[in-house]
Swiss-Prot record:
PANTHER family: APURINIC-APYRIMIDINIC ENDONUCLEASE (PTHR21445:SF0), ENDONUCLEASE IV ENDODEOXYRIBONUCLEASE IV (PTHR21445). The gene is nfo. It catalyses: Endonucleolytic cleavage to 5'-phosphooligonucleotide end-products. Zn(2+) 2 binds at residues 143, 177, 214, 259. This is Probable endonuclease 4. Zn(2+) 3 binds at residues 180, 227, 229.
Amino acid sequence: MPLFGAHMSAAGGVSNAIRDIVEIGGEVLQLFTANQRQWTPKAPSEADVEAFGRRRAAFGGPVFSHASYLINIANGDGAASAKAVEALVREFERCTALGVDAVVLHPGAHLGAGRGTGILRAARNIDEVFDRCGGQTPVLLLENTAGQGTCLGGDLNDLAEIIDASRHASQLGVCLDTAHAFGAGYALHTDEGYRRCMEDIEHGPGLAAVRLFHVNDSLVPCGSRKDRHTHIGEGQLGEAAFVRLLNDPVFAMHPMVLETPKEDGHAADRRNLATLRRLARS
């Protein structure tokens, strides 16, 4: 069975995210290591890093960070590109201090420059981040998108081409978001649509490149090019889509993280985790 968990808040200190994932019975954690709405957020204190390490050792599961949504790694503007690179370097530094396994990053938007140009810019900027960090760094996972606007990643080949264009391809992988794939036109709720998605992964970045799943149902229709998450089984993907994924032997031990609404605190996370585990036994 896959490892199930959720994105948890780090409010009050990053170690609180570990505390809360244990409380809800999660086996894998995703978090923001700092305020993702700020370009230069405050780094975790030394005491919080130590507390995170203690709780992480007791938790024992994989930990992922989601990079700030402010970062457009495909930006070609000099100042904006430098700002994106700097923000990702700082993210890597925080993750290295915390012992985070991998960083999830949206592949960015080309802003009208064209898909090919955006892909090359993303690869160049990613290479600069790895060059500046050197040594031991977390793995960087490029997340697929719903393909909204000029965003890269709606086509899974975008992720493959960024990886192929990077000098640090061995340190790159893929995070597959079910709601994003659905929004981009992959009908994961049908046998044919699921098969097409898996074939595009296999012929693009490769199945081995997929290190993490974001398991989210979708409020919007397939192919809408929109990104609206909802609870498992309550959206247009429906339970059938998740039965296919959760019981696919290729991903039998993969980490899978919820990014579903938290309007009632941790209760929704508990319900969604219970649903995933039930469907994984279907």
